[in-house]
Amino acid sequence: MTSEEIKAIVYYIQGLQVLWKEGYNAEKVALYSYQFNLRAGMDMPDELLDVIEMLEMWDDNWIYGAVPLTEKEAAAVIQEELNIDIYHPEKDIIALVTNEFISQLKNECSSNRIVAKALENAQELIIYDEYFVALQNILSELLTHHIHIPADILSIIDIIEDSYIKRLQASLWGV
């Protein structure tokens, strides 16, 4: 998954959260999903396209008697397809970003012993759902040893709002 695809997921979820705060309305969710799909202008993973299609489906089919998805059904679709809890997505988003970053770093740099050791240590933290700490440790280790990371991999963590991770990432851009 590219950083662009991750951003699409996060932006879509953030938009849905705003709608959910106003109270769930299937028609508004369908319209938002339709408009997001049209205007996103970015690459979207298949899972996100599936969610968008399912949430806007009732809008297209209401004439034929289709019943709109309930709030629970819509939340279940998002959870099942994207593995993100719409009510509390923060942990799921950091998990998605961290796992994707590790996966691509492993594919690109696994022959480097320092990277391999940092990834191994991170996996131990992930077992305990310590995604922020795992990501911080990996970035710190890469920076300490001045290890160059390809820009497309480093950009995966752009979506993380943590100031310490942002500083580490900014420092790694210069390596």
Q: What annotation goes with each model-predicted range?
A:
Residues 1-175:
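Acidic, Ser/Pro/Thr-rich low-complexity regulatory regions
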